[in-house]
Amino acid sequence: RVMDDEDRKIIAYHEAGHAIVQAFVDDGLLPIHKVTIIPRGQSLGSTMFTPKKDILNHSKKRVLNQICCAMGGRAAEEIEIGDVTSGAAGDIRMATNIARSMVCDWGMSDLGMISFGDKQDQVFLGKELSRAQNYSEETAQKIDLAIKNLIDEQFDRAKSILEENISALHVSAEALLEHETIEGKHVH
């Protein structure tokens, strides 16, 4: 794929957004390994982490931080170019899956400690895991709203972090444009 300067800039800010937010919210267990704007597979760039240990239990704080980091790319695009791109599709999917688990499986929302919908484990012919809907349409709407609220709150949090650390965002994006890949220790 051939990327023009505008695409490179958008991708650099997108990845820098993830990196700055992660550097800000990290509790020391998921430091940034490296950030790159070199395309690989379906991804136009990536921010890679090196876990300090296997994380077996996910705290609410940590999963909110994951959603916040996922939203950092989209928030950086909005701040820098005043628009958003389709580049955040995978981030949005991941954030939605985490938020859905928080609401439906882990009792980490205002809906309380209730499990909504049994996951169907029969995966065949390339179909994804599905959820049996054993609740009313009204409850489904509450679940959707709770998921949306979790993601919206973390997007706003990511945007605030980036606005408060705008010079770090610019420095990291410029470093990515110049070097294409930067080590995590250079993100600050």
Residue ranges and their predicted role:
Residues 1-5:
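P-loop NTPase nucleotide-binding/switch module
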Residues 8-13, 19-188:
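Soluble catalytic regions of large protease machineries
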